[in-house]
């Protein structure tokens, strides 16, 4: 007869009619009973031959991705001119007085951020844009290129000009200028004042691209500037438009312009196939002999192009420079030939664009280190796209980077901190990750880009193969013409116009601000926002500012007070160069929505959309059918988030955790499903802990337990000896049920930690319910008043300790000790006794 649900509830002491707790509870620690119940509920059955279920409602296995949907009308989001001020520490000090050591350390971490992986794997440019949408290859290519171009224009990416130089838009930081031979970028006064220099012969010859750039430049990670002779410099104004290598090189740097000095670079024919001859850019743009460009100092800069004749290779016939413009002079091969499209415009614009500033970078190969693709911005906003960058190579394999850990407030700390009668609002930081600047030395490791449209299309169409010897010759120019490509490009022409030409060229971009796809970024963002909030909290001691990643919340006593705080904080953040999105500021009233929780003066509960998800999950959950452990991972993730709000908490999910660990399928019995279902249908808020004096103490030995409740002492014995942790847990439960006290003193670290998942399953579930909302204070064994009763000695009465309990707010220091501050700020309090901070994260 399988265990009925009612009987199971009674067994777990969840119903009122249970006998005395001192008799009932120790039974739940019995191994034999736990085994029988597990068998009854199919909790640990050996593997079964029934096929596993791989999908439950929306939950599929962890690694089976849902099929993404491409939207041809995606809008590329606009990025404001984000420039975090370099003197951020000075500005904060003007605002709040001297910063604490902690705040300074955190702000220095992101000014600039540095990234040096152990080794970097370089991928061919063809892998730059992932063929994520096979039906919309060309459309996705151009949308992605447009997104990358937008990021470059917004100063978020560097563009690789040559293997040792890059250009960017926006405002430069001093560490970018320092790379220019230790000097600032040339000011307008120095235009043309310097003679032309030959490059010094001391420059080491180029070594082949190794798996790791770092080793060679260990001494100076920024590319050995100290040993370099001055680079060839023409009369070109402030931002160097060209970097030329004066000694003839057999490998031409990717994407470099023809050299101004007049030397003809000798290309090897091999490089034609591997670096795609469109690297000779403006040579093809022959109908415009010079292109004017505003330099950053406001002077027009002229770039003289070499006539195409000088760029011919000696070893083969004419090499065509620009794949796109070649179609202009060729005969149409069909009705869908690209030459029809190219002839629509006389002026297709330049082959490449250059940034306002040029800097030196460590040697960067013409490769990428991660692929990119587009997805919906979020489930609620499918009109805009979001760029996904896959730098997962740094988290995999033997050379993987172990990312720094950082403190995330646990649920109880968060509740202690934010559960109050304040009015709340949350600020939206636009493109938060793109605020934090990266040092240029990280550029060779974080490269994205594309190989240009011609190679991209050729790669994907199996019938046209790129042969080394015929690349760029007429016979395979029209190989890429097809009806599908022609129709796609005609439609895209309406959107992008003459930019189609620019986007069809290869490009390599490195990150100038931290990208989302690297494990370092969340850490840096968390450090940055927590330091800023710490500064705000000290400037307005009567208010509360708190952040988790890019989610910043402000709380104040009244709505009027909150509005004035909002104005002051917004102005402060804008003065630092942090961009806020005022349209997305949310005013929450007295219950704050934050990190998936609703937090009010009554405590914390999960947000409504999460409870709806849980209900839906239980509706779809099959009974008596083995479910794939990967699907169980998804289910447990959802249920685990809401577990602290249920009667039995995490211990109720232990059977699921066990099967995931064993990588076995899990079968829900009707009783276990009904039990979980009932658990999650009634959620109880997690309340904030209150400070107080501990009056109740519990202690146990393997054979007996003892309590000290005020001046009263109690003791009892167990039927059979129990493991010490189990005995201590039982004693704590008895203390709670006898006294009703929410504050109990114990000398057992496991009970203090409130992790009841390692106890016998039934006992863990019952204890979680009995001890819900209880706070523990650590009392050393020698001073524990319950120590004597637990050893059977009632006569001796040790005096009760005065043990105060102060709830902790995790690592969020609300009472940061300020360095000497202006006198108008009130004195701050500092609680730092290890004995008082007794709370351990659940």
Swiss-Prot record:
Organism domain of life: Viruses
Site (Priming of reverse-transcription by covalently linking the first nucleotide of the (-)DNA): 63
Any one GO biological process: symbiont-mediated suppression of host innate immune response
Amino-acid positions noted as binding Mg(2+) in the UniProt annotation, renumbered to this chain: 428, 550-551
One GO MF term: metal ion binding
Keywords for the protein's UniProt record, in alphabetical order: DNA replication, DNA-binding, DNA-directed DNA polymerase, Endonuclease, Host-virus interaction, Hydrolase, Inhibition of host innate immune response by virus, Inhibition of host RLR pathway by virus, Magnesium, Metal-binding, Multifunctional enzyme, Nuclease, Nucleotidyltransferase, RNA-directed DNA polymerase, Transferase, Viral immunoevasion
Region (Polymerase/reverse transcriptase domain (RT)): 346-689
Region (Spacer): 178-345
Signal peptide: none
EC number(s) stated in the UniProt entry for this protein: 2.7.7.7, 2.7.7.49, 3.1.26.4
HAMAP family membership: HBV_DPOL
Miscellaneous note of the record: Hepadnaviral virions contain probably just one P protein molecule per particle.
UniProt family annotation: Belongs to the hepadnaviridae P protein family.
Protein name (database record): Protein P
Organism expressing this protein natively: Hepatitis B virus genotype G (isolate United States/USG17/2002) (HBV-G)
Gene name for this UniProt entry: P
């Amino acid at each position: 007869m399988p265990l009925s649900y009612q009987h199971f509830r009674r067994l777990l002491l969840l119903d009122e009619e249970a006998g005395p707790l001192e008799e009932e509870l120790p039974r739940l620690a019995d191994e034999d009973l736990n085994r029988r119940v597990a068998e009854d509920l199919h909790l640990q059955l050996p593997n079964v031959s029934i096929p596993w279920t791989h999908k439950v409602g929306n939950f599929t296995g962890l690694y089976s991705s849902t099929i993404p949907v491409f939207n041809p009308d995606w809008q590329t989001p606009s990025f404001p001119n984000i420039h975090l001020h370099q003197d951020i520490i000075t500005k904060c000090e003007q605002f709040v007085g001297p910063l604490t050591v902690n705040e300074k350390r955190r702000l220095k971490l992101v000014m600039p951020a540095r990234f040096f992986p152990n080794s970097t794997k370089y991928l061919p440019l063809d892998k730059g844009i992932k063929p994520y949408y096979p039906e919309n290859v060309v459309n996705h290519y151009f949308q992605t290129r447009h997104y990358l171009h937008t990021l470059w224009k917004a100063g978020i990416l560097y563009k690789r000009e040559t293997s040792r130089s890059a250009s960017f838009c926006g405002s430069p930081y001093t560490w970018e200028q320092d790379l220019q031979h230790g000097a600032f970028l040339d000011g307008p006064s120095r235009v043309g004042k310097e003679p032309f220099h030959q490059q010094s012969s001391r420059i080491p010859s180029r070594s082949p691209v190794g798996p790791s750039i770092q080793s060679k430049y260990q001494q100076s990670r920024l590319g050995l500037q100290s040993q370099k002779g001055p680079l060839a410099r023409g009369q070109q104004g402030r931002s160097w438009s060209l970097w030329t290598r004066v000694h003839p090189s057999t490998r031409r740097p990717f994407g470099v312009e023809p050299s101004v000095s007049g030397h003809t670079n000798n290309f090897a024919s091999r490089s034609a196939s591997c670096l795609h001859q469109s690297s000779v850019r403006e040579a093809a743009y022959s109908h415009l002999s010079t292109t004017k460009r505003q330099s950053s100092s406001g002077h027009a800069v002229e770039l003289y192009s070499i006539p195409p004749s000088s760029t011919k290779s000696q070893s083969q016939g004419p090499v065509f420079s620009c794949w796109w413009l070649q179609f202009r002079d060729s005969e149409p091969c069909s009705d869908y030939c690209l030459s029809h499209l190219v002839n629509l415009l006389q002026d297709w614009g330049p082959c490449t664009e250059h940034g306002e500033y040029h800097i030196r970078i460590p040697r960067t190969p013409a490769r990428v280190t991660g692929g990119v693709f587009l997805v919906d911005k979020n489930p609620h906003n499918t009109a805009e796209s979001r760029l996904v960058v896959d730098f997962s190579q740094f988290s995999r394999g033997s050379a993987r980077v172990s990312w720094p850990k950082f403190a995330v407030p646990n649920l109880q700390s968060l509740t202690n901190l934010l559960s109050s009668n304040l009015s709340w609002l949350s600020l939206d930081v636009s493109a938060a990750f793109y605020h934090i600047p990266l040092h240029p030395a990280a550029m060779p490791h974080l490269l994205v880009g594309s190989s240009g449209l011609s190679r991209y299309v050729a790669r994907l169409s199996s019938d046209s193969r790129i042969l080394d010897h015929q690349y760029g010759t007429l016979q395979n120019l029209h190989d890429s013409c097809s009806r599908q490509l022609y129709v796609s490009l005609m439609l895209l022409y309406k959107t992008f116009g003459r930019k189609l030409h620019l986007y069809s060229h290869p490009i390599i971009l490195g990150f100038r601000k931290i990208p989302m796809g690297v494990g370092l970024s969340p850490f840096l963002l968390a450090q940055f926002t927590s330091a800023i909030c710490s500064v705000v909290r000290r400037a307005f001691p009567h208010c509360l500012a708190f952040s988790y990643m890019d989610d910043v919340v402000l709380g104040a006593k009244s709505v009027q007070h909150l509005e004035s705080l909002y104005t002051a904080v917004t102005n402060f953040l804008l003065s630092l160069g942090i961009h806020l999105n005022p349209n997305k500021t949310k005013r929450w009233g007295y219950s704050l929505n934050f990190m998936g929780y609703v937090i009010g003066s009554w405590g914390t509960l999960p947000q409504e959309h999460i409870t709806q998800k849980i209900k839906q999950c239980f509706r779809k959950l099959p009974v008596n059918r083995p479910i794939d452990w990967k699907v169980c991972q998804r289910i447990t993730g959802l249920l685990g988030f809401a577990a602290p709000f249920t009667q039995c908490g995490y211990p109720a999910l232990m059977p699921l955790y066990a099967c995931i660990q064993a990588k076995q399928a899990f079968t829900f019995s009707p009783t276990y499903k009904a039990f979980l279902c009932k658990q999650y249908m009634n959620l109880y808020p997690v309340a904030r802990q209150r400070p107080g004096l501990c009056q109740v103490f519990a202690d146990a030995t393997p054979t007996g337990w003892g309590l000290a409740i005020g001046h009263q002492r109690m003791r009892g014995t167990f039927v059979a000896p129990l493991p010490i942790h189990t005995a201590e847990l039982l004693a704590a439960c008895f203390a709670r049920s006898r006294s009703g006290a929410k504050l109990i003193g114990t000398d057992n670290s496991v009970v203090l930690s409130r992790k009841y998942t390692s106890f016998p399953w039934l006992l863990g579930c019952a204890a979680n319910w009995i001890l819900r909302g209880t706070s523990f204070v650590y009392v050393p064994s020698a001073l524990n008043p319950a120590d004597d009763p637990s050893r059977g000695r009632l006569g001796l009465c040790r005096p009760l300790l005065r043990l105060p309990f102060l709830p902790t707010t995790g690592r969020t220091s609300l009472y940061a000790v300020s360095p000497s501050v202006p006198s108008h700020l009130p004195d701050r309090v500092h609680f730092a006794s290890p004995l008082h901070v007794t709370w351990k994260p659940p």
